[in-house]
Amino acid sequence: MASEAPPFWWDEPDWRALALAPAAWIYGRVSGRRLIRAVPPRVSLPVLCVGNFTVGGAGKTPTAIAFARGAIARGMKPGIVSRGYGGNYSGLHLVDPGHDGARHVGDEPLLLARHAAVALSPDRVKAAEYLKSLGCDFIIMDDGFQSARLHADFSLLVVDASRGIGNGRVIPAGPLRAPLTDQMRKTDALLCIGKGNGADFVIRQAARAGRPIYHAQLRPSSSATVAGRRWLAFAGIGNPDKFYESVRQAGGEVVETHSFADHYSFEPDDIRGLVDMARRQGLGLITTAKDHVRLATMPGVPPEFLSKLAVLDVDLEFDRTDALDHILDTVVERFKSRLHG
């Protein structure tokens, strides 16, 4: 079972954040110093890093998918490097969406592998070189910003507009993976996803640092099956409220919600409980594409449950129509400068 971020991380700082401040200071010193001082190894391919400032969901997966699609549309062959959070693979592995299970490789890599080749490895350089040997000519690094284990020609940091960076404190007092000032120094651009003012502070910091700021929305891609129906919506992702809002945007009525920890491994009792709750209230069951990947590759999940389970997927849409191409151009230009500089 995956661990869940403490709810107080996303509220105003309270006594818990204060009590954990000494530990957060130590963590921040170490993580910030590693980020600033690291000289990551390079590969002879353009590398785009899609990361975020905090633990938890911000929209990295649909962002990585959008860039994979964009690269393919330009005639490129992108490959995605991932650590495979939520799985248990420790070696170098090329994800096979037809045979791999989420418990083995993680749910996000399975989703990403529907769009591009995905190589899993703690050694991101080895993963990138392997993708190059397969003919890939553009690398998308899914997360890995703070670890600094592979040089990125462009680091795009994703933030959720409604949640922002929570209480603004570093782990374990808050959700930040390193002090914001240190992270911003290594950030090339900010992508704010959704509506809301929760990210106003980090947007101001990015503007003050002279970083480009892009905006995008997550649009439901399967509204026809959702609209006009009453749902029990459930999710085991970093920000389940964002998913519930997407169901509403697609025209569905969310009567009940059930949230699980991020990357949650469902048990048979969970499935029975959801089915019983939905049946009692006459509701349909709906979940995320990421949760569906985990459920569909779990042993023992009743086929009738999967056949009746609705899935709402989302696509990333930039507010500026030229934003995605502009970022891809920048990545390639920086790579060429690095190669010939």
Swiss-Prot record:
Give any GO molecular function from the UniProt entry.
ATP binding
> What EC number(s) does its UniProt record assign?
2.7.1.130
Might you report a single GO cellular component term? plasma membrane
Q: Name one GO biological process term.
A: lipopolysaccharide core region biosynthetic process
Query: Pfam families this protein is in?
Result: LpxK (PF02606)
Q: In which pathway does it act?
A: Glycolipid biosynthesis; lipid IV(A) biosynthesis; lipid IV(A) from (3R)-3-hydroxytetradecanoyl-[acyl-carrier-protein] and UDP-N-acetyl-alpha-D-glucosamine: step 6/6
Please name the InterPro entries in this protein's record.
Answer: LpxK (IPR003758), P-loop_NTPase (IPR027417)
Question: Which reactions are catalysed by this chain?
Answer: a lipid A disaccharide + ATP = a lipid IVA + ADP + H(+)
Q: Which residues bind ATP?
A: T54, V55, G56, G57, A58, G59, K60, T61
Presence of the UniProt keyword DNA-binding in the record? no
Q: Which UniProt keywords apply?
A: ATP-binding, Kinase, Lipid A biosynthesis, Lipid biosynthesis, Lipid metabolism, Nucleotide-binding, Transferase
Task performed by this protein = Transfers the gamma-phosphate of ATP to the 4'-position of a tetraacyldisaccharide 1-phosphate intermediate (termed DS-1-P) to form tetraacyldisaccharide 1,4'-bis-phosphate (lipid IVA).
Give the record's family classification.
Belongs to the LpxK family.
Q: What is this protein called?
A: Tetraacyldisaccharide 4'-kinase
